[in-house]
């Protein structure tokens, strides 16, 4: 009998637009007509959330089903789903409000402008034990740059090269500016209440960092880890592989907390660890897998690609025990051939336009939605 897997789910943001890659905002209309879709402050992107699933077969179908539904709605209007995590061909200087009457959206536009008009995927892992949850948040905060590097898909902005592999993370307003590594649940509660009192956070959701604890009544009632750093990963096999990588890393922590919790096993102070994690994230946003990072254990320099490979090799026996070895294999392909941003930049350097890359990517997304791993959705 296989060990139990964690519950997990996705929060997926998507851009809509023309097959040629230009952004066209229809989020308000979609949210009114299609259950399960919600608007973002800008109408050019929208969001859906999957229900928690332990099974990766069911999780993959939960990921793809809303995309198919949305695609059917878009097609008669000559629109499609677009890859990428920034306004690759869109007007990045102009905000297009999805709800002009919403005061919170007014605040977002006035404070951040189009820096928040991005597409991403947040990965949630169910963890109800507070001690384990905060240990996992600490570890994944210190290794979040690895997951950003695997997912990077935003090398373009406004029809130009951005100079970054993840322009989304480069421009996204981390809020508050400095977030500590939380020692425990009480530390987190006290810190959030202090941020709310000073106005550094406008509400309990206004914690925009690479990873955070989440739950039905933040900051008090928590039941999951939310990884927020990843760019949009449109290939379901790649996203599932990244999720398996994340889950197996947390599983290793559960089995070896004293060795893998940075609070217990790092030579650095918590303040230094927080600074190191943020610096690694910034380095990964620039050149992703080629970035030189610093390891949380002792601050030593290590290439991002090499660090991921070390972890991958260490977790493959556990992946086999959980029946997840095949699901994990796309990580090796990403390390060999590059993430979406790197592959796009290689093809762009050969003379292909951004429009052509987005058009090909949109077609690939549609083809990927026809593939179901494991059982047929009709049986579920």
Name every feature range the model reports, one short phrase each.
Residues 85-89, 129, 231-233:
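Active-site-proximal loop/turn and secondary-structure-junction residues that shape catalytic pockets
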Residues 7-15, 40-49, 78-89, 113-124, ...:
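Core alpha/beta catalytic barrel or barrel-like domain that forms the active/cofactor pocket
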Residues 84, 104-121, 125-187:
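Metal-dependent DNA replication initiation modules
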Residues 88-90, 154-165, 262-271:
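Short proline/glycine- and acidic-rich turn/helix-capping motifs at secondary-structure junctions
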Residues 1-79, 92-93, 101-105, 170-380:
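C-terminal accessory/tail domains of diverse enzymes
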């Amino acid at each position: 009998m296989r060990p139990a897997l964690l519950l997990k789910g996705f929060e997926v943001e998507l851009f809509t637009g023309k097959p040629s890659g230009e952004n066209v905002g229809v989020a308000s209309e979609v949210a009114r007509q299609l259950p399960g879709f919600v608007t973002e402050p800008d109408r050019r992107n929208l969001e859906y959330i999957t229900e928690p699933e332990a099974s990766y077969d069911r999780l993959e179908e939960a990921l793809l089903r809303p995309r198919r539904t949305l695609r059917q709605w878009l097609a008669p209007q000559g629109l499609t789903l677009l890859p990428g995590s920034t306004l690759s061909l869109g007007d990045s200087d102009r905000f297009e409000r999805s709800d002009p009457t919403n005061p919170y959206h007014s605040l977002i536009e006035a404070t951040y402008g189009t820096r928040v008009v991005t597409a991403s995927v947040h990965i949630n892992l169910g963890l109800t034990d507070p001690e384990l949850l905060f240990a996992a948040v600490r570890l994944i905060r210190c290794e979040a740059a690895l997951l950003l590097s695997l997912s990077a898909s935003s090398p373009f902005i406004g029809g130009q090269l951005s100079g970054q592999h993840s322009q989304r993370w480069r421009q996204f307003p981390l809020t508050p500016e400095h977030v500590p590594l939380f020692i425990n649940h009480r530390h987190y509660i006290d810190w959030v209440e202090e941020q709310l009192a000073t106005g550094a956070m406008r509400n309990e959701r206004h914690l925009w960092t690479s990873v955070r604890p989440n739950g039905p009544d933040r900051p008090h009632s928590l039941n999951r880890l939310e990884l927020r750093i990843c760019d949009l990963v449109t290939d379901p096999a790649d996203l599932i592989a990244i999720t398996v990588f994340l889950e197996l890393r947390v599983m290793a922590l559960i089995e070896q907390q004293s060795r893998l919790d940075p609070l217990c096993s790092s030579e650095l102070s918590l303040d230094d660890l927080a600074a190191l994690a943020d610096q690694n994230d910034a380095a990964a946003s620039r050149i992703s897998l080629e970035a030189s990072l610093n390891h949380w254990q002792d601050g030593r320099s290590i290439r991002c690609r090499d660090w991921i490979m070390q972890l991958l090799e260490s977790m493959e026996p556990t992946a086999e025990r959980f029946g997840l070895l095949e699901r994990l294999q796309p990580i090796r392909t990403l390390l060999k051939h590059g993430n979406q941003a790197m592959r796009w930049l290689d093809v762009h350097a050969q003379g292909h336009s951004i429009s052509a890359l987005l058009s090909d990517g949109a077609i690939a997304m549609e083809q990927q939605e026809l593939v179901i791993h494991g059982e047929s959705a009709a049986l579920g």
